[in-house]
Amino acid sequence: MKNIIRRPYLDKIEQALGKDTIIVLVGQRRIGKSYLLRQLRDEKAQDSSANIIFVDKEKKEFDDIRDYHDLNAFIDGHRVKEKTNYILVDEIQDIAEFERTVRSYREEPGTEIVITGSNSFMLSSELTTLIGGRYKEIYVQALSYNEFLTFHQLPDNDDSLAKYINLGGLPGLQKMGLDENDVREYQQDVLNTVLLKDVIMRNNIRNPVFLDNLIRFLADNTGKIISANSISKFMRAQGQSITSTAVINYIKALCETYVIHKVNRFDIHGKRLFESNDKYYFEDNGIRNCLGGGNREGDIEKVMENVVYNHLVRLGYEVTVGQLQASEIDFVCSKPTGERVYVQVAYIIADEATRKREFGNLRAIHDNYPKYVISMTPLVTRSDDDGIIHLNLRKFLKEGLV
């Protein structure tokens, strides 16, 4: 099996090395953090001045490393003072009080630390407290469409796009030949591991049945504006009593695993964020489809929106949902530089009513920021309709907002 280099992420790691900072790779389990860490290990192993200290907490040979004392002892037993020591630890959140180790060795000369973790609360909140925020977080996403084509040696065509939309971008699918039955079984195993290890065990969840129902509800309502209160009411109607506070806590726990992402609403006129009624998207559209039935009629727009959201994040945008009086803009995308774009997602612009709705919402925004409609309308690759750019989904995933 060909070893595919995820160069953009390795470049980000390289740029952060040598700056007396801890590099933290974060993201959902099985998204490729371990793969990247091994690639970094293999690249640095070619350097005679480098000494690699590698710990993978998912491998049985490292079971004895349970807390920071064990980790310190392992590192001390493998350090070479005359070389640059690269301390690489995979799934570090499974080591009790790991923060003490990374804080201590960060200050050692000739030492670089790169760690991975699946739980954002463990990494972001506790590291900030214990090491004063002196770390670089690199968020690793599921495969992009371009990476998907490379991993699976596929041509760029509509059939490959359909596979990407349906099966998603977990790197582990490379081993399965994209057989849908095998893929769904693998995705369910990944999800079960995340729910058990990163949600139920870590948060002492006492109602796993509701947790399962909740994530299925979020899959079925991908891209819809929902609230904790509306979920609570829906669950009560299904015979399951749950408070809005409990819903909020369960969703927070899910977001901390990176399986789902909460997207706030943004008041375009008032230029402020709303404090309630958000949208949720899945890190991997394949896992979303595993839960929500990606081949069902009516699901395609939900999945498309999920795919577009993730690619906008991949392009470096902070993404919110736009509220414009009574109408909605699917995505308001901004960067720290002040750049902003508006994006509407539609499956097919098949008639004038659809065109009026999708383009009309964007025309109601009276500013000069770029505006896009992304669709799968046949024969459309890129067109300009009175200043609103209509992009084909495949072109967007290949080339970005062009």
At which residue positions do the language-model features occur?
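Short glycine-rich substrate-engagement loop in P-loop NTPases that contacts/grips substrate
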Residues: I53-K83
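Accessory nucleic acid-recognition modules appended to NTPase machines
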Residues: E180-E339
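Hydrophobic positions on the alpha1 helix immediately C-terminal to the Walker A/P-loop
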Residues: L36, L40
